[in-house]
């Protein structure tokens, strides 16, 4: 069966950068691509790579190749604040390209050098300075080549000609006059320069109902995108894509088929990559084990209460039970870092809760001042915290008074001994919000919408009480709930985890990617807490 590679694709994660850009979840695209027999998939969200690990793991679980990509906003220059955001699709060819693309994403969110100006942006020079590990397409009608900047276009084209092995001119199938004209211009340019045509789809919805729901939500939020009338931004099978080009009739079909085949050429250029799934605890010392052992044994004599309740022999015996487990579970760097934080807290008169969670089972943690719970005295189980036969990412929650919690988080986010970031958290539309938004778009009276919300029923699902709309409401308001069901639980915003801080010694900007928000002065990790934990990154929770 003939097929192609979809690389220009937007999910609801694009809505974190562009308001209500899609109401389609990534799982829907992945399932559809698998159903169509596609062998690779990329998400090119507008100006972000948010939760790329979730996409990678799900795409690979579906038996397809994950392709790391982004639709970047590109400006002529960062020397002045001009709002000229041209679109380019950037695709990582391999692991080095993955790191490079993450760095470019991080750079685009710098709010101090004009990179972030209404949108996260890189400069055209950044595009032209990419390595051979990055594949580039000219994207959509919002791309540079559809602008009136002749001098700038010539600059890019001259550069692209010298990199034609990895730069492609993107045509699209949308049956609108401007796209038809643009496709023809790109074909002429391709003939003149030897740059290859490739077909992008600029997919924003899995199907027509989701496309309608996208418009409904845009209306509800007062969002309007120019020049989308007549566009078909829904997912296309190979046959549907071919038929769309036949109807568009912008180019000879042999040229279209070649542009479709080029998507598979690009897919073949991309090397799958594995992630380092080892522990990534912050490392403060080169000789961690030696430092740890000395700290632990020295603390027998320096701890204010250890020898008051236990003999030295009893303490040493317990230490010798725990130390090998810490070594085998690779937790020593984490414990040293946690002690470093506790020492700072004590020096700054910050009170921490006496002990929370399984760490209180460790006598070594007690000796080092990480917990105030004496696990020998209270007969607590160490192996609930650390177990060589059940190794998990180490996590210690700490309780603070609110002012101290803020101070500790700020310390972690500014400490020059480590690299750190806030952690992404995503806001979704819940049932009541979906009813209100869709009701507003459908111009239902506010009182009636409020009455509908008041009539929601509470049921228990998997042990949790949740609100649902009963059959009576659904029968009375079929159009309302048609769209409510499509937009409920869709991502509409991004913020930060209220307690967690990502702490590392490795370069977060390239191994994960960072972005910025107007609500915090600190950079934020592109993966949420689940993606970070799955890849063994360290998160400290400062709880109130």
Language-model features, listed with the residues they occupy:
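Alpha-helical scaffold/interaction cores of sigma-54-like transcription cofactors
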Residues: 1-544
């Amino acid at each position: 069966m003939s097929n192609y590679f979809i690389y220009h694709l937007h999910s609801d994660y694009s809505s974190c950068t562009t308001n209500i850009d899609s109401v389609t979840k990534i799982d829907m695209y992945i399932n559809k691509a698998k159903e169509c027999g596609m062998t690779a998939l990329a998400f090119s969200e507008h100006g972000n790579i948010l939760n790329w690990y979730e996409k990678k793991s799900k795409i690979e679980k579906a038996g397809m190749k994950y392709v790391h990509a982004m639709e970047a906003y590109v400006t002529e220059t960062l020397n002045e604040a001009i709002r000229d955001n041209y679109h380019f699709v950037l695709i990582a060819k391999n692991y080095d390209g993955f790191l490079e693309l993450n760095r470019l994403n991080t750079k685009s969110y710098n709010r101090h050098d004009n990179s972030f100006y209404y949108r996260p942006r890189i400069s055209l020079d950044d595009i032209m300075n990419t390595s051979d590990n990055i594949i580039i397409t000219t994207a959509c009608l919002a791309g540079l080549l559809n602008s009136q900047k002749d001098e700038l276009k010539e600059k890019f084209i001259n550069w692209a000609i010298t990199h034609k092995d990895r730069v492609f001119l993107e045509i699209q199938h949308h049956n609108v006059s401007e796209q038809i004209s643009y496709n023809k211009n790109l074909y002429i340019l391709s003939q003149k320069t030897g740059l290859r045509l490739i077909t992008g789809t600029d997919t924003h919805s899995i199907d027509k109902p989701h496309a309608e729901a996208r418009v409904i939500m845009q209306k509800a939020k007062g969002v309007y995108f120019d020049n989308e009338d007549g566009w078909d931004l829904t997912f296309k099978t190979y046959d549907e894509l071919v038929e769309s080009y036949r109807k568009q009739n912008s180019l000879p079909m042999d040229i279209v088929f070649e542009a479709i085949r080029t998507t598979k050429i690009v897919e073949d250029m991309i090397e799958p990559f594995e992630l380092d799934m080892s522990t990534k605890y912050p490392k403060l010392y080169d000789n961690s084990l030696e430092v740890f052992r000395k700290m632990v044994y020295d603390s027998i004599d320096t701890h204010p209460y250890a020898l008051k309740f236990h003999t030295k022999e009893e303490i040493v015996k317990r230490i010798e039970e725990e130390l090998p487990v810490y070594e085998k579970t690779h937790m020593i760097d984490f414990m040293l870092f946690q002690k470093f934080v506790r020492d700072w807290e004590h020096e700054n008169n910050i009170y921490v809760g006496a002990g929370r969670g399984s760490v209180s089972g460790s006598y070594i943690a007690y000796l080092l001042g990480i917990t105030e719970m004496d696990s020998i005295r209270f007969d607590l189980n160490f192996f609930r915290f650390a177990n060589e036969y059940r190794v998990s990412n180490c996590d210690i929650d700490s309780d603070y008074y609110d002012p101290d919690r803020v101070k500790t988080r700020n310390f972690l986010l500014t400490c020059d001994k480590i690299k750190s970031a806030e952690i992404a958290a995503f806001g979704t539309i819940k049932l009541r919000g979906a009813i209100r938004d869709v009701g507003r778009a459908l111009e239902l009276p506010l009182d009636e919408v409020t009455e509908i919300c008041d009539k929601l029923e509470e049921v228990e699902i998997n042990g949790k009480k949740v609100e649902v709309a009963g059959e009576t409401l659904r029968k009375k308001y079929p159009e309302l709930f048609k769209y409510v069901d499509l937009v409920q639980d869709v991502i509409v915003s991004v913020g930060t985890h209220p307690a967690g801080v990502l702490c590392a010694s490795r370069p977060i900007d390239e191994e994960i990617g960072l972005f910025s928000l107007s609500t915090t002065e600190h950079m934020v990790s592109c993966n949420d807490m689940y993606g970070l934990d799955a890849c063994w990154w360290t998160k400290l929770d400062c709880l109130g």
